Amino acid sequence: MVKVIASSVRKGNVLEVDGKLYVVLTAQNFHPGKGTPVTQIDMRRIVDGVKVSERWRTTEQVERAFVEDVNHQFLYEDGEGFHFMNPENYDQIVVDVETMGDQKAYLQEGMTCVISMYEGVALALDLPRHVTLEIMETEPVVKGQTASSSYKPAMLSNGIRTLVPPHINAGTRVVIATEDNSYVERAKD
């Protein structure tokens, strides 16, 4: 275990609090006008999946567990969960639906992800920063509509809705940021 200050904790880190391990879901630093800056951390207990919210002063020390980040390739999904393979030794692991969370929408066969492992158990999953998806449907552009926002809603091939520029139409392949579902650019393929 390593002691770190609360403000340096990030999503996906594993913390030990009161002898139990937690995976960080969100970590936000707040600097109120008066008073001490604090870090609000939402976590999930690894043993039973209970979600907990903690608030620490940004300079407080918290214990971070050592986790191993290992590249894995996504194979398939079934009733057990999501199956991944380590390309170095061909070991396969199953990641449950709760650990995957909302990220499952971006998984594509053969995609390489970084899985955080603690004593052989998958705790968190990091997708590539950008994925290429196809626009399934989008609204038509209204000419001369310059007073409002220049982005329009669109439905992606994985079922997620996002905003795209007016020149993007259905059938176009685009690059999307997995962190916030935002449009990055038109795909170059």
Swiss-Prot record:
Pfam families (alphabetical): EFP, EFP_N, Elong-fact-P_C
Chief localisation class: cytoplasm
SUPFAM superfamilies: Nucleic acid-binding proteins (SSF50249), Translation proteins SH3-like domain (SSF50104)
Any one Gene Ontology cellular component term annotated for this protein: cytoplasm
Pathway assigned in UniProt: Protein biosynthesis; polypeptide chain elongation
GO terms of molecular function: translation elongation factor activity
CDD domains attached to this UniProt entry: S1_EF-P_repeat_1, S1_EF-P_repeat_2
PROSITE patterns named among the record's database cross-references: EFP (PS01275)
Stored InterPro entries: Elong-fact-P_C, NA-bd_OB-fold, Rib_uL2_dom2, Transl_elong_fac_P/YeiP, Transl_elong_KOW-like, Transl_elong_P/YeiP_cen, Transl_elong_P/YeiP_CS, Transl_elongation_fac_P
Compartments where found: Cytoplasm
GO biological process annotation, one example: peptide biosynthetic process
Known function: Involved in peptide bond synthesis. Stimulates efficient translation and peptide-bond synthesis on native or reconstituted 70S ribosomes in vitro. Probably functions indirectly by altering the affinity of the ribosome for aminoacyl-tRNA, thus increasing their reactivity as acceptors for peptidyl transferase.
Family, as annotated: Belongs to the elongation factor P family.
Name of the protein in question: Elongation factor P
Native source species: Allorhizobium ampelinum (strain ATCC BAA-846 / DSM 112012 / S4) (Agrobacterium vitis (strain S4))
Species classification: Bacteria, Pseudomonadati, Pseudomonadota, Alphaproteobacteria, Hyphomicrobiales
GN (gene name): efp
